[in-house]
Amino acid sequence: MRVGRTLASGLFGAALVLALAGSPASAADGVQRANVVGGSGPDSRACGLSDWNATACFEPYGEWFWLKDEDADGLPVAIKWWYSNPGYPSRSGVIYNDHGKAAGWTNVNKSFEENGQITYELCEFDVPTKSTDNCWGTGWSHT
């Protein structure tokens, strides 16, 4: 009887820990500041959106988002993205670059299930409110 109760209690505790623990990949979603990497950027085939203001790219191998500010106007730029894959929770987020044009390429590494789809837009970004504005274009890629 005591062994059964101890075993049941242990199983319940393990289930509770698993239920309350968020996955590492989803915990990093939301609004993220891109890292300055300098040097060469992504494979040009990965770049789905570009204009005078910024360039946005997604490399499916390794799941890297790349963002480059192309205008020295001091205004941050962002990638607004969505991930979908049947059988898995949808995810979304914003990656912003407030380092300026002189920083060159910036990036953020994500982790997605294979065979999903990434859709993304290029946007202006307001750092104090953590909000996007004037988004345009639609890039997409498979994971």
Segments the model singles out, each with a brief description of its role:
Residues 27-143:
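Post-signal peptide N-terminal regions of Sec-secreted extracellular proteins
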Residues 1-27:
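Secretory targeting and sorting signals
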